């Protein structure tokens, strides 16, 4: 736990100079990214908290850090005495917006960098601040955390960009742009502005490496009825990228030109409206509801801009047949790597009695993955956790200080990889000794929830919000639960966390029905602080299913799991399973064995482990 006093003192000095009483520091970058480059880790620099979600609020006298249930334990360990932890979602705990507003009473000024907060979020915060008696929310264009950070702030990455060929992307750029223009035409819209990095990468069939674990690059895009413009540092583009963009009629402009161009376009459209006459564009500019307040302001704000769920994000979430085949294929290869890893780890710990720590295990898994076709890198830092560490939902082991894996305690491994044909995310919880009855019961309740969701059949139009209880039902019957969502969308060689779909209790999961081609995780869990944690995660694709009847002339949907890794036989309490659940497990084990055994010719150790862990459950 580092002392945050020096950076807080610098920030407060800068706040006083600007007559700011409350300063909001979001986690995200100017593209609303969940995972960010080191240069954008402002909240981490100021607070010491390294989780991927949260918001810091600093006043002249106090400081608070708000985060969700995935990070309660981690934040409690990382924050020093300067900070109050706001555990979001718990009863009687204010939201970060409420806490910030409460500090503004008496006409005090609340400020934020407008490039780091969505326009809709800024409006909500402003309303709450005004209601609490504060002054209007101030958009402070200079980021004063960056000033406090000074020369020690890392440089912005400038990694090369590569083309994702159509045989892997499944849909050409021209088709994607034309489909987007059709959406714009419905609203007589003069332009859509793309700010999310994964949306830009998907739209132009390009991939980058500016943000760790996410194959994206710093960029914006503007799509009008006549033009398509990519704003990017041109030094990132080699001749193959330039040729690819020329062939698809995409202009390239410098990254820093985006906001000046947006302001100029607003001026031009405003002039056309005022001039009147035939051909006048009457629609508003469209931006994502995740786009920054700064973008909305550049385009004229209210009256000129309409915020909506991004049509690019919606299209990206529905995988085409090529992408779905890629997801199937990469999960088989990824499953083979995990199977080889678990067999190796058990041999090291239980048979050879060799001490392996959490980071050494994670490094070995990455080494095994790297041997497989199309491997690019990890899709997030591996959560390799033993014993009580497994109860920390997003635990991050650190070299030199992490725990040695105890074969007599639960081991939880949540990991994933980026392959050029897809993105993986798999969690398995194992025990290399004799698990307790409590551990077996918890594991089996979680497994029953995973099966319940995997086997769900539901009418078209159903949201992930409606399905969440299927994964929790068996835990609920025992008075248990978990403080995270059940499922998130997954990109295709893109971000491992992808909207707009998901399975959980978040409001946004009520907005978009699941559709064939969606790819989601299925990851129920249970965590006993200070003791152990259980999580099991598969990746599933939504598909149409045939039913005996067709009530209301609706089509019905279900899931196809693509993860190919056995469950831990020693943690399964067989008497808790129904006959149908046992049949599902046996069919799954047969599927895993059939799809992965070909990778282990001549590898007796791994083949023996795979055979044992896929044996029939009686």
Swiss-Prot record:
Binding-site residues for Mn(2+) 1, renumbered to this chain: 425, 523, 537
Gene Ontology cellular component list: cytoplasm
Binding residues annotated for Mn(2+) 2, in chain numbering: 414, 425, 537
A Pfam family matched in the record: Peptidase_M24
Keywords: Aminopeptidase, Hydrolase, Manganese, Metal-binding, Metalloprotease, Protease
Cofactor note: Binds 2 manganese ions per subunit.
Catalytic activity entry: Release of any N-terminal amino acid, including proline, that is linked to proline, even from a dipeptide or tripeptide
EC code: 3.4.11.9
Cofactor entry: Mn(2+)
Signal peptide: none
Metal-binding in keyword set: yes
GO biological process: proteolysis
MF annotations from Gene Ontology: metal ion binding; metalloaminopeptidase activity
InterPro entries associated with the record: Creatin/AminoP/Spt16_N, Creatinase/aminopeptidase-like, Creatinase_N, Pept_M24, Pept_M24B, Peptidase_M24_C, Peptidase_M24B_aminopep-P_CS, X-Pro_aminopeptidase_P
The family this protein is said to belong to: Belongs to the peptidase M24B family.
Known role: Catalyzes the removal of a penultimate prolyl residue from the N-termini of peptides.
Name this protein carries in UniProt: Probable Xaa-Pro aminopeptidase P
Species of provenance: Metarhizium robertsii (strain ARSEF 23 / ATCC MYA-3075)
Name of the coding gene: AMPP
